[in-house]
């Protein structure tokens, strides 16, 4: 299989390597800015599909894997923060609260396209102002949906998790492996 990961995420590269190391990376140039959907879960599936198909059209015969992840706080979508203030706003909203993380996964071989969304509920302990200030002073929150890396320092805030841990990291490994095995 000529497998292409349509993502520049180092976490997705690492997680896909659990399934196979035989893949290449081609970052999608899909424009996400005008994409809308009725729910965050539907949005993330549309984004994953858009990224996947944007790469698939230029690579006939390849199997392309596209993904996207969003944090859902009561219906409000948190993507990657645009600034320190944006990251702090997100972390304040997540502090002491439950939110959902949705990861959309799409696979296409140019003839057939299949996708799914995996969702996970996450509850954080209250996060102090000092912790938020210290965390946002690092590079960690700025390339992650919801301004946190669960596999990083944000693990200290994790109270409860319901679902697949890898969904939070951006690639639900077992469901993705099952989907890829059908191509």
Label every PLM stretch briefly.
Residues 7-9, 28, 95:
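Short linear Ser/Thr-Pro motifs
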Residues 24-33:
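A short beta-strand-loop structural module common to alpha/beta enzyme folds
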């Amino acid at each position: 299989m000529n497998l292409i990961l349509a993502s520049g995420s180092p976490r997705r590269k690492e997680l896909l390597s659990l399934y196979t190391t035989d893949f290449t990376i081609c970052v999608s140039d899909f424009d996400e800015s005008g994409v809308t959907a009725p729910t965050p879960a539907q949005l993330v599936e549309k984004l994953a599909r858009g990224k996947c198909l944007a790469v698939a059209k230029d690579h006939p015969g390849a199997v392309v894997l596209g993904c996207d992840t969003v944090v859902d706080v009561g219906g409000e979508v948190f993507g990657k923060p645009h600034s320190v203030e944006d990251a702090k706003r997100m972390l304040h909203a997540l502090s002491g609260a439950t939110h959902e993380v949705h990861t959309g996964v799409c696979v296409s071989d140019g003839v057939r396209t299949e996708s799914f969304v995996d969702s996970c509920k996450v509850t954080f302990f209250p996060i102090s102002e000092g912790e938020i200030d210290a965390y946002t002073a690092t590079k960690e929150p700025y390339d992650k949906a919801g301004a946190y890396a669960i596999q990083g320092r944000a693990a200290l805030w994790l109270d409860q998790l319901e679902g697949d841990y890898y969904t939070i990291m951006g690639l639900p490994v077992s469901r993705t492996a099952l989907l890829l095995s059908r191509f």
